[in-house]
From Swiss-Prot:
PANTHER family the UniProt entry points to: PEROXIDE STRESS RESISTANCE PROTEIN YAAA, PEROXIDE STRESS RESPONSE PROTEIN YAAA
InterPro entries referenced in this protein's UniProt entry, alphabetically: YaaA
Protein name in the entry: UPF0246 protein PA14_18590
Signal peptide: none
Family: Belongs to the UPF0246 family.
Source species: Pseudomonas aeruginosa (strain UCBPP-PA14)
Length: 259
């Protein structure tokens, strides 16, 4: 089973990594192509394109200028530890042991507007480029066109390498939109996490993002390979709803937040 999650806007390059193991991203040449294009934009253009404040636009212009593909532990950080945000709070990789990282490396990946796909231990230099950004490029009008079927091909190869055909989608619609479902040689399992609010179960973004991370953590810590075991997920009060679920659409409900 292979899991996909979204990246995060918030990054942490201050906290020392809890593992010294690292690998290199597999689409660095494509990332460099995008960086070269982004370097041509002024901070004002970046602000307008990405709807960022002047301060954030300036920060990312500086990031693009200093980005270079010789990734080392001194100028980059493992992706799973560099990303911060609700999904990564739920995942809590900071307390992983080496065996956890080893399993995650083969069974988890992060989709990225700049890097395409990142494995947990892939080094990453800081950036801001969301998949939904309408950055016109040589391959089309946006990043979905830029990545084309490359991400789907990567996922197929990763699944084949582990001898499996189950893809667990824990990513947002924005990012999973970069995956060509019809090109996947896999069974795709989608997930929904709903919380009770005003008498109805609803998807509440903050809680749902955190729950996706908790589900990824559950799979990693339990070394789960059989998707049937996903129904046993019960972190922080969530429980599987057979009534609302389908064969490839797993719905988890929660009656009250426990965090």
């Amino acid at each position: 089973m292979l899991m996909v999650i979204s990246p995060a806007k918030t990054l942490d390059y201050e906290t020392p990594p809890v593992t010294h193991r690292f690998t290199q991203p597999q689409y660095l040449d494509h990332a460099q192509e995008l960086i070269q294009q982004l370097r041509q934009l002024t901070p004002l253009q970046i602000s307008e394109l990405m709807k960022l404040s002047d301060k954030l636009a300036g920060l990312n212009a500086a990031r693009y200028a200093s980005w270079h593909p010789e990734f080392t532990p001194e100028n980059a950080k493992q992706a799973l530890l560099a990303f911060k945000g609700d999904v990564y709070t739920g995942l809590n990789a900071e307390d992983f042991g080496e065996d956890d990282f080893a399993f995650a490396q083969d069974h988890l990946c992060m989709l990225s507007g700049l890097y395409g796909v990142l494995r947990p231990l892939d080094l990453m230099q800081p950036y801001r480029l969301e998949m939904g950004t309408r950055l016109a490029n040589a391959r089309g009008k946006d990043l979905y066109a830029f990545w084309g079927e490359r991400i789907s091909q990567w996922l197929n190869e990763a699944l084949a390498a582990q001898g499996d055909d189950v893809l667990l989608n824990l990513a947002s619609n924005e990012y999973f939109g970069a995956v060509k479902r019809k090109a996947l040689q896999a069974r795709v399992i989608d997930t929904e996490f709903k919380d009770l609010k005003n008498g109805q179960y609803k998807i509440i973004s903050f809680y749902a993002k955190k729950a996706r991370g908790m589900m990824a953590r559950y799979v990693i810590r339990e070394r789960l390979r059989d998707p049937a075991g996903l129904k046993d997920f019960n972190a922080h009060g969530y429980y599987f709803s057979a009534e609302q679920s389908g064969p490839d659409q797993l719905v988890f409900l929660r009656d009250a937040p426990q965090d």
